[in-house]
Amino acid sequence: LDIDFTIISRSDSTLRGHYPTETQVIYDVLKQNHIHIDGEILCPYLDGIRRTENDIHYVLVNDVWVPVGKTEFAKDKTFSFQSSNLKEYVEEKTNKAYLASSCISLSIADLQDESLVVSKLNSVSGFRKVIVNCTCMQDLQKFVSAYEKTDKRYIFRCAASLVKELGHITDSSYLEKEDCINDGLGGLILVG
């Protein structure tokens, strides 16, 4: 392809699903085709019901923020996991192929300094994992603003809120057929 593109792995769920197999296969196929990927960004934030703070991912359950490793999602029979800390989750799910200590964390405080986030993202290589902490849409918007200024290419493993921000999609009513047909604006490929 002679066009720039972004790969976003959404799967069944950000943390459940065939992780890390899906993103690793995507990475391997791109590498075989001489397309360089620097890292993988994990951002399971979902507005109003999921948040990540100090690398711990939480799910809102009955008005209480519960570490994801203690929820029903972590006990899924096919895709179970124990870690609520996303760095440890990466280590757990990759069977230590990527250690928690090798993950780069973008804290809430980091997100307040765009140049710091750009610098951290530009330092990534070797398909290292980047954990994005977000507690609100403003955090996510700050991350996207910094990401768009980087020189690197990533595969994303994320929830729907990040897709919306990366695509600069505003809230609107459902699309009509006429809204979807426009040959000049690129496209979206869905596989499922």
Regions found by a protein language model. Give the residues of each.
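Extended, basic/helix-rich recognition subdomains
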Residues: D139-K142, D151
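Acidic, glycine-rich loop-and-beta core segments that form the ion-binding/anion-interacting portion
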Residues: Y147-G192
